[in-house]
């Protein structure tokens, strides 16, 4: 059956011939902890991917149709750096940066346009940062304010088959804000604002015959607000 995504114009079809994918990973981590919750960690990792499931594209009556297919195998290797630091009393900065290299081996005689490429859905660069202010007022009352930034590098959104180029989601920046206030040990208030920047989500498709890319779709998810009130027994 077909279903329509909440965002974007593609229709999605399942694949009853899919097999489970498996991954086997090794990682090595160094961590250092300081006072006031300060922390630094560096992680290196390697993953072997057996029959990874990837999103692919096809054409059906001129409409955009996406489905899923197993690749033969693949690998992912990268490094991740994370730190937390108290700047002044009640004000804390945290950040995370990762770089990842991926490669996929495709089935012999398959219809994939690019015979060697990165793993679908994997961004080579990911970054997150947050600035948090959390003062206390007495024993029970506390204010929590946080500004959160995310960077997601360009990644393959749907794999090209039958001479169709790969569709790539372009680099995306997002900024969120959250606020919370504990009135006492029972009552608390919360405000969440997602995607303050409301940037366009842009997709471009490779044109194999010319080696260029053309924009095929863009949309905005919009900025949304959540207000909550909670009670703890």
How would you describe each model-predicted region?
Residues 1-26, 36, 44-69, 148-162, ...:
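Surface-exposed extracellular loop regions of Gram-negative outer-membrane beta-barrel proteins
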Residues 9-14, 54-55, 65-69, 93, ...:
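Glycine-rich loops and low-complexity Gly/Arg-rich segments
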Residues 15, 25-31, 39-41, 68, ...:
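Membrane-embedded beta-strand positions in outer-membrane beta-barrel channels/transporters
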Residues 21, 33-35, 74, 86, ...:
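A short, compositionally biased micro-patch
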Residues 21, 25-26, 118-233:
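Conserved C-terminal beta-signal and adjacent last beta-strands/turns
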Residues 45-48, 67-158:
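Gram-negative outer-membrane beta-barrel transporters
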